[in-house]
C-alpha cells in the first residue's frame, strides 16, 4: 500500500514539477564523472567546515522519500552545486543547466511540497498495518494536497 502511495506521489511530482527529471540528470552527470565529482569535492571542501562532501544521492523510485532527501541535501549544498556547474573546466557540459535564485526557490518549494507525502509514507509504513479507513484518509489527503498545488 505504501509503495503504491509513494509511486503516486512521484507521478504527482512529475506533473507538478517536470524539472525534477532535469535536476536528477544534473546530479547524475556530476556523480558519474570523476572530473566533475572532483570539482564538486574541491568546492565543498573550501565552502564547508565539515570538509569534503559527496554530491547528493539520486532519487530512486523504489526508495521511499528519496526525492525529498535528494532535494534536502541539494539545498544544503546549493552553493557547491552552483559553483560546480559554472566551473570553467566543465561549464560547457552544463550550458543549458544554469541555476539561478528562482530555480533554487522552485527546488525549495518542491521540497516543502514533499514533506506531507513523506510523513504519510513514513506513518503508513510503520510497525502497525494501516486500516483501510486510515489508508483512505491518507489517499484523500494526498489528492487534496496535489489538487491545491495544481
PLM regions: where:
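A eukaryotic "domain-edge + linker/cap" signature
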Residues: 1-150
Amino acid at each position: 500500500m505504501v509503495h503504491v502511495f509513494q509511486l503516486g506521489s512521484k507521478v504527482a511530482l512529475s506533473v507538478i514539477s517536470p524539472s525534477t527529471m532535469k535536476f536528477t540528470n544534473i546530479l547524475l552527470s556530476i556523480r558519474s564523472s570523476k572530473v566533475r565529482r572532483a570539482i564538486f569535492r574541491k568546492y565543498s571542501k573550501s565552502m564547508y567546515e565539515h570538509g569534503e562532501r559527496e554530491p547528493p544521492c539520486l532519487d530512486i523510485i523504489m526508495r521511499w522519500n528519496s526525492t525529498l532527501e535528494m532535494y534536502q541535501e541539494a539545498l544544503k549544498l546549493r552553493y557547491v552545486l552552483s559553483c560546480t556547474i559554472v566551473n570553467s573546466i566543465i561549464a560547457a557540459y552544463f550550458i543549458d543547466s544554469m541555476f539561478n535564485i528562482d530555480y533554487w526557490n522552485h527546488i525549495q518549494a518542491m521540497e516543502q511540497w514533499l514533506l506531507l507525502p513523506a510523513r504519510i509514507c513514513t506513518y503508513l509504513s510503520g510497525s502497525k498495518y494501516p486500516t483501510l479507513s486510515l489508508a483512505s484518509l491518507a489517499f484523500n489527503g494526498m489528492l487534496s494536497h496535489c489538487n491545491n498545488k495544481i
